[in-house]
Amino acid sequence: MIPGNRMLMVVLLCQVLLGGASHASLIPETGKKKVAEIQGHAGGRRSGQSHELLRDFEATLLQMFGLRRRPQPSKSAVIPDYMRDLYRLQSGEEEEEEQIRSIDLEYPERPTSRANTVRSFHHEEHLEDIPGTSENSAFRFFFNLSSIPENEVISSAELRLFREQVDQGPDWEQGFHRINIYEVMKPPAEVVPGHLITRLLDTRLVHHNVTRWETFDVSPAVLRWTREKQPNYGLAIEVTHLHQTRTHQGQHVRISRSLPQGNGDWAQLRPLLVTFGHDGRGHALTRRRRAKRSPKHHPQRARKKNKNCRRHSLYVDFSDVGWNDWIVAPPGYQAFYCHGDCPFPLADHLNSTNHAIVQTLVNSVNSSIPKACCVPTELSAISMLYLDEYDKVVLKNYQEMVVEGCGCR
């Protein structure tokens, strides 16, 4: 069974096992009577068997998601606005401009062209001043990337820093500062104090009268840590101000929470490390433009009582199976399913293969040979934004999740 169909089977069976009228809408009409019969015959055995089957189905789904166990998100888990916006842009929802929080957000076409998974990491709260630098102008901090699976190949990574406008002093409009990003090559304990061994990863000269996010390429460091299995000693940020006094050093690049700032605001402004990787399954993320679906016109669809093979509506709601606590978006999706007859002779619009035509022809003279079956002939992917078992936010592309076309095969 292909991964997409297996996913749908897991979702449907879980909802059948959970029972209740609220789940009936997800079961095709042709299957409701059969479900009722199964539930009736099961009797007292239903509870124990259902629990065991549900556990097995959930394990299958988690394995497909690349998760070792079911995520149990903590109440303190934060979904970065950047990841929400990236999901909206990637899934074709950019028309809803009022929902895009990052005004200066640009879709990372190049990084996503070789990735089907995007992960985000906040830095550890503890910061270390780097000795030998001017007051509060350089810090060393750490991102824990141990949750990245072994089979995921990282292709690129970026560090996002939020900087605020500073309007102090008469010459602030002419002020510039340079932001340098370094990889720490040796831990501080192994080097002479004041002489931290680093290598420059990226640098930028920016005007300090603008409030915005800045993105830096830290791919060389992350590739060393993940591909080459080199020790991760963290990153260092250095802010060098031009045309400004020392009293303003480090004030407008946000790498730590200010005292008057609430936890909610700081959670969205913290430095964010974003990795782009591929687990070897499926295609890379591709930006989709939302378009109104216009179902292909088929003459038989105009007749309500037509029973020929076609696509039917099937909405999968993650809240019905209790997965909405760790699946951030979408809340559900239209999966569709294929159902209907494959009559002889097969019409062109039934999207049949030569084999299906021959099989249907033989069936017309020999009923022991089954008819061709109504099955999906075209499937598409969906993107999912979720929290993994380590409370890390993941955006991933899953193939073969939506039926786009049906046919007799």
Curated annotation (Swiss-Prot):
<feature type="disulfide bond">
    <location>
        <begin position="309"/>
        <end position="374"/>
    </location>
</feature>
<dbReference type="GO" id="GO:0035993">
    <property type="term" value="P:deltoid tuberosity development"/>
</dbReference>
<comment type="function">
    <text>Growth factor of the TGF-beta superfamily that plays essential roles in many developmental processes, including neurogenesis, vascular development, angiogenesis and osteogenesis. Acts in concert with PTHLH/PTHRP to stimulate ductal outgrowth during embryonic mammary development and to inhibit hair follicle induction. Initiates the canonical BMP signaling cascade by associating with type I receptor BMPR1A and type II receptor BMPR2. Once all three components are bound together in a complex at the cell surface, BMPR2 phosphorylates and activates BMPR1A.</text>
</comment>
<feature type="glycosylation site" description="N-linked (GlcNAc...) asparagine">
    <location>
        <position position="209"/>
    </location>
</feature>
<dbReference type="InterPro" id="IPR001111">
    <property type="entry name" value="TGF-b_propeptide"/>
</dbReference>
<dbReference type="GO" id="GO:1900182">
    <property type="term" value="P:positive regulation of protein localization to nucleus"/>
</dbReference>
<dbReference type="GO" id="GO:0030513">
    <property type="term" value="P:positive regulation of BMP signaling pathway"/>
</dbReference>
<dbReference type="GO" id="GO:0060426">
    <property type="term" value="P:lung vasculature development"/>
</dbReference>
<keyword id="KW-1015">Disulfide bond</keyword>
<dbReference type="GO" id="GO:0005615">
    <property type="term" value="C:extracellular space"/>
</dbReference>
<protein>
    <recommendedName>
        <fullName>Bone morphogenetic protein 4</fullName>
    </recommendedName>
</protein>
<keyword id="KW-0339">Growth factor</keyword>
<dbReference type="GO" id="GO:0070244">
    <property type="term" value="P:negative regulation of thymocyte apoptotic process"/>
</dbReference>
<dbReference type="GO" id="GO:0035990">
    <property type="term" value="P:tendon cell differentiation"/>
</dbReference>
<dbReference type="GO" id="GO:0001823">
    <property type="term" value="P:mesonephros development"/>
</dbReference>
<dbReference type="GO" id="GO:0008285">
    <property type="term" value="P:negative regulation of cell population proliferation"/>
</dbReference>
<dbReference type="GO" id="GO:0032967">
    <property type="term" value="P:positive regulation of collagen biosynthetic process"/>
</dbReference>
<keyword id="KW-0732">Signal</keyword>
<dbReference type="GO" id="GO:0001822">
    <property type="term" value="P:kidney development"/>
</dbReference>
<feature type="signal peptide">
    <location>
        <begin position="1"/>
        <end position="19"/>
    </location>
</feature>
<dbReference type="GO" id="GO:0001958">
    <property type="term" value="P:endochondral ossification"/>
</dbReference>
<dbReference type="GO" id="GO:0030509">
    <property type="term" value="P:BMP signaling pathway"/>
</dbReference>
<keyword id="KW-0221">Differentiation</keyword>
<dbReference type="GO" id="GO:0003139">
    <property type="term" value="P:secondary heart field specification"/>
</dbReference>
<dbReference type="GO" id="GO:0003129">
    <property type="term" value="P:heart induction"/>
</dbReference>
<dbReference type="InterPro" id="IPR047833">
    <property type="entry name" value="BMP4_TGF_beta-like"/>
</dbReference>
<feature type="disulfide bond">
    <location>
        <begin position="338"/>
        <end position="406"/>
    </location>
</feature>
<dbReference type="GO" id="GO:0008083">
    <property type="term" value="F:growth factor activity"/>
</dbReference>
<dbReference type="GO" id="GO:0048392">
    <property type="term" value="P:intermediate mesodermal cell differentiation"/>
</dbReference>
<dbReference type="GO" id="GO:0045839">
    <property type="term" value="P:negative regulation of mitotic nuclear division"/>
</dbReference>
<dbReference type="GO" id="GO:0033088">
    <property type="term" value="P:negative regulation of immature T cell proliferation in thymus"/>
</dbReference>
<feature type="propeptide">
    <location>
        <begin position="20"/>
        <end position="293"/>
    </location>
</feature>
<feature type="region of interest" description="Disordered">
    <location>
        <begin position="284"/>
        <end position="308"/>
    </location>
</feature>
<dbReference type="GO" id="GO:0090194">
    <property type="term" value="P:negative regulation of glomerulus development"/>
</dbReference>
<dbReference type="GO" id="GO:0055020">
    <property type="term" value="P:positive regulation of cardiac muscle fiber development"/>
</dbReference>
<dbReference type="Pfam" id="PF00688">
    <property type="entry name" value="TGFb_propeptide"/>
</dbReference>
<dbReference type="GO" id="GO:0002062">
    <property type="term" value="P:chondrocyte differentiation"/>
</dbReference>
<dbReference type="GO" id="GO:1901331">
    <property type="term" value="P:positive regulation of odontoblast differentiation"/>
</dbReference>
<keyword id="KW-0325">Glycoprotein</keyword>
<feature type="disulfide bond">
    <location>
        <begin position="342"/>
        <end position="408"/>
    </location>
</feature>
<dbReference type="GO" id="GO:0002043">
    <property type="term" value="P:blood vessel endothelial cell proliferation involved in sprouting angiogenesis"/>
</dbReference>
<keyword id="KW-0597">Phosphoprotein</keyword>
